[in-house]
């Protein structure tokens, strides 16, 4: 900024010098032109007076010779005096112009000095104002930064507190939800346990009922098998005595069919009880037991019938029984 001010002052000084030089040059030219004009006027006056003096000279040339020479000299002296006066006048004007030019230059220098001092003062004031404004701006900036820093710290703390509060609320809500879920799960577990126990009790009761029915059916079947075996044996004996019938195996087949009929459970009865697999297992065990009883009874009856036949054969035969089925003919006695 100072260099720009210096350049402005230098330009002002140069302009002032050029103006003073122009003024001096113009005044010198006017003075010189005035001198030339004065000399020309003096010459014209001298020629006019010379011509007028020559016209009046006539008859008395001799008388007026001395006087004429004096007039010419007088005219020449007058012209010289006029030229000197004009010279002095224009010389004074030139001196006055030079003095005025000098005064103008001095005034210009004074004005330039004053302007330079004024410019320097203004520059100092401007610098001081700029420095003051800069300091004020820096102070305001620092204040704003401090306020912003405090505001940011407050907002950060508020955000941190809000986040902590939200986290605490979320934790409490999660705990409450977990407690509710745990209670609901425990309640569901108790309900499921009670339902399972109830179903198990119902199943157990159903199995017991089915087992009891199966035992009853097995008992009935066993009794029926025994009755059928006895009836079959009696029928076989009658048929043997009469030479008719299908024999012991046919009778046993009838007994087997009766056992199957007794052990067969209708689909409606099957659907009345729980646990189809357990029921089938119980029924299978009951059927096996019934079959075992059946075959034991069969063997027992077979042995009894064989013993009875042998006894009858012994009673009827002395030397031997003609019947091919007689046991003693085969070495079984």
Swiss-Prot record:
SUPFAM superfamilies: Apolipoprotein A-I. Residues 3-52 form a coiled coil. The keyword GTP-binding does not apply. It comes from the Eukaryota. Keywords: Coiled coil. The keyword tRNA-binding does not apply. Induction: In seedling leaves, by salt stress. One of its GO terms (cellular component) is cytosol. One of its GO terms (biological process) is cold acclimation. Residues 116-163, 172-219, 227-241 have a biased composition (Basic and acidic residues). Residues 1-20, 116-246 are annotated as: Disordered. PANTHER family: LATE EMBRYOGENESIS ABUNDANT DOMAIN-CONTAINING PROTEIN / LEA DOMAIN-CONTAINING PROTEIN (PTHR47877), LATE EMBRYOGENESIS ABUNDANT PROTEIN 17 (PTHR47877:SF8). Belongs to the LEA type 4 family. This is Late embryogenesis abundant protein 1. The lineage of its organism: Eukaryota, Viridiplantae, Streptophyta, Embryophyta, Tracheophyta.
């Amino acid at each position: 900024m100072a260099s720009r001010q210096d350049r402005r002052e230098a330009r002002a000084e140069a302009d002032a010098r050029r103006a003073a030089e122009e003024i001096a040059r113009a005044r010198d030219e006017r003075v010189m032109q005035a001198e030339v004009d004065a000399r020309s006027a003096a010459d014209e006056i001298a020629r006019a007076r010379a011509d007028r003096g020559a016209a009046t000279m006539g008859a008395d040339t001799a008388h007026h010779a001395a006087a004429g020479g004096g007039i010419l000299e007088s005219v020449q002296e007058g012209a010289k005096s006029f030229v000197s006066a004009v010279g002095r006048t224009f010389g004074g004007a030139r001196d006055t112009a030079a003095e005025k030019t000098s005064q103008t230059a001095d005034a210009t220098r004074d004005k330039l000095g004053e302007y330079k001092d004024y410019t320097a003062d203004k520059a100092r004031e401007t610098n001081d104002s700029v420095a003051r404004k800069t300091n004020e701006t820096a102070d305001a900036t620092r204040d704003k930064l401090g306020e912003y820093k405090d505001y940011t710290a407050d907002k950060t703390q508020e955000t941190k507190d809000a986040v902590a509060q939200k986290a605490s609320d979320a934790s409490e809500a999660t705990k409450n939800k977990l407690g509710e879920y745990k209670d609901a799960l425990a309640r569901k577990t108790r309900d499921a346990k009670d339902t399972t126990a109830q179903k198990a009790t119902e199943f157990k009761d159903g199995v017991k009922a089915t087992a009891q029915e199966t035992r009853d059916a097995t008992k009935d079947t066993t009794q029926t098998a025994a009755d059928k075996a006895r009836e079959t044996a009696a029928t076989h004996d009658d048929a043997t005595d009469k030479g008719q019938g299908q024999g012991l195996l046919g009778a046993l087949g009838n007994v087997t069919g009766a056992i199957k009929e007794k052990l067969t459970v209708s689909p409606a009865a099957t659907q009345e009880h729980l646990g189809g697999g357990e029921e089938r297992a119980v029924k299978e065990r009951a059927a096996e037991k019934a079959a075992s009883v059946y075959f034991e009874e069969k063997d027992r009856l077979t042995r009894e019938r064989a013993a009875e036949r042998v006894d009858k054969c012994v009673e009827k035969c002395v030397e031997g029984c003609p019947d091919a089925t007689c046991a003693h003919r085969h070495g079984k006695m």
